[in-house]
Amino acid sequence: MKSLNVTRTTSKKKAEPAEEPKKVEPAKTEDKKKEEKPEKQTANMYSADSMASFVDNYFLSQRAIWIDTDIDTEMCSYAVRQLNLWIDGTKLPVYIFINSPGGSMHVASAIVDTMKALEAAGSKVYTINVAMAASAAAIIYSAGTKGCRYSYPSARIMFHQGRYIGIDADLKAEDLEIYKRELEIANEMFTTLLVNASGMTLAEVKAMMSKDSYFSAKEAKKLGIVDKIQVFTLP
């Protein structure tokens, strides 16, 4: 007998594309963190800079300035500009607190000129020697309105002739003559101012300024330079 060859056919199924795995989201937790809001940063009103600014602004609001550094061009710009602002027709008093080792005689002259302009406009110019008024600072102090020159009890004041410091050694004889003449003009001007501001004679002022002459508040009052000895407070 012939054997029957039976072949079995299997139906081929088309391969289906595999499903993409689903992304598993993390489980949500009930206690969500609240968004943290940045804290507002406020300026520290008690910092050194803030307090200094507050004090400076207070004094300026009372028409008061401090000459408490070397009397140089920077001080000139500050003091003269501020004093000029107060030549405003109000005739309100102006207060100058002083604690300075001195400095430029030209700057002192500019400040004194502005003080006299304030007086001419009807304002009294109070000068208050807090600790030390030396050299050019002593001239500014003395130029205050008579009767309005205060000194703290322990304050000192020092007068001497004007001088040039740190002059270049490489100078001609003509240059030295120019410096000498400038000093003579400045010293004559300051001597006249002190005679008018005090009870001293011209000879007494010249003798005082011929050297470094230091005075206590009481001694300066006897000379007619200080009017009142007390700690001064703004009205």
Predicted regions and their residues:
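Terminal-region recognition feature
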Residues: 1-235
